[in-house]
Every structure is written in structure tokens, then in C-alpha cells.
């Protein structure tokens, strides 16, 4: 991915890019509670004006607080269930798989088709991490998930939609 990626965005896609930016910027801070290497790696490859996200410190602090809490919960679950299957519902541009991967988990990133299209422009995901482009309200997505071990469902992305 040497060229800059220019995603076509509108509406809630703005929020996912701003959240992605907030995690990347926080990861560069001196006293961070998590380091999001994937966000740091990819944020500069995205051709997008992040100035709104840079100015919105309240939104950024909310993203960071949620990330710290959810990371801890997911980490604890994976430590107890190392061969688990995780479904990240309304994933947006979440990079938690890359922070939590133990080499065994199976991870599904689920979101609306237009969101997954943007995600697929930015991430090259395959193997134990894959994407499902379908509404969380459509029960058909469950047919795409191959369960291995215990299941964890993350709904952090749904908690940010107003």
C-alpha cells in the first residue's frame, strides 16, 4: 500500500475515521494505556482531512476511554478462552484484532456493506480475521461465522451511534 487511500465517505463513516485517528494519535502519546500499531501505520496512508478529529478533544477522549475499557474486557476473555471466536459488530475501522491477536483466535469484523467497502480499501485482512458486509440486524450474517471455541460479541461500534 504505497499510494494514499482516498475513501469515499459520508455520515457515520466520518465518525469511524475520526475514531481511527484518535486511536492513532493517542498511541503516539507518552503515557498511553494502549498502543495501536495498525492505526499508527495506516493513518498516514489515508487521504482524508483529519482536522475536525484533531480539534474535537471530547470525542477523542471518549474513543480512548472506550478503547481502554473494551481492550481490557476482550483481553481477559481471550486469556481465559484462547481458541475463541470473536464477532466485532459495527466494527468500523476498529483494529482491536491486531492488539489482541494471540495467534489462535478467529475474528470477524461485521458492519454495513458500505463500511466494509471502506475497511477493505484500508486493511488487507485474511486468514483468522475476516469481514462480513451486512447489517447486524440481518440474521443472515450468522451463517458466515464459523464458530470455534467460546464466542465473544463486541458491540462497541453500536454504542457510539446516535
Features from the language model and the residues they span:
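A short SAM/SAH-binding and catalytic strip from SAM-dependent methyltransferases
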Residues: 150-162
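Rossmann-like AdoMet
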Residues: 1-87, 91-134, 146-148
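Adenine-nucleotide cofactor-binding loop residues
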Residues: 137
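Soluble catalytic domains of membrane acyltransferases
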Residues: 142-146, 152
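A short, conserved alpha-helix within the catalytic core of class I
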Residues: 131, 140-142, 160-162
